[in-house]
């Protein structure tokens, strides 16, 4: 049995003021977030499940000694929320684990997140994330970012970037939207890259220079919008809508059901595997000529 420190508390509402209404195309003056947070299950099989994570949900348990210094509510840990929904948390706060985390999503980011449903499947996903190729169960993730306009947008529309120890493939849909695929992962990888390399900070990402939309950075305009898993010969693709209650920041980028517009959806569905493979070959050649950790761009 595991103890996560899950605490059940009565429902409540947090209110966040809109400070840039032109960025949301909304008539509202604030955004209301209801707690406990709701997490939608999108798909599952005998190996894994895909949930739609809302902003504010934590991918891991925080240090409670510091959490309550800045928060007046209990930490909404994603794993606790989905375990609670499955009815597996007992009165004493313990449970037999039903889900095993494969990867993480930053707290203010929304979208698809994969959990394995048994220890063996978790090991297979971890094996692929570590070694790549055909080893284990493969996981492909694409994110949509709504960004500020960049002076270099027309010069740098798509390609593979190795920077700060991580590799990312990206494509600009238009002046305000980027789609990015993680080839190798690192903390805050996309958020740093959009600001420091692409000159396109994400809306409301105050930590990395984004345009302020709300009076808090509880949510940024970054969404895990596409997940592809390959287990043996079985391939599953999932397009993930923006969760209900968190669509305001996206304005006209999404419809009333949280689905992205046709241009964004089209790019999300594109298979970049061949292109990324060719770019990685070019990257390997360039790496032999350049110093470690130097920015490398190939297309």
UniProtKB/Swiss-Prot annotation:
GO terms for cellular component: mitochondrion. Keywords: Isomerase, Mitochondrion, rRNA processing. The active site is at residue 106. Its EC number is 5.4.99.43. It catalyses: uridine(2819) in 21S rRNA = pseudouridine(2819) in 21S rRNA. One of its GO terms (biological process) is enzyme-directed rRNA pseudouridine synthesis. Belongs to the pseudouridine synthase RluA family. Pseudouridylate synthase responsible for the pseudouridine-2819 formation in mitochondrial 21S rRNA. May modulate the efficiency or the fidelity of the mitochondrial translation machinery. This is 21S rRNA pseudouridine(2819) synthase. It comes from Kluyveromyces lactis (strain ATCC 8585 / CBS 2359 / DSM 70799 / NBRC 1267 / NRRL Y-1140 / WM37).
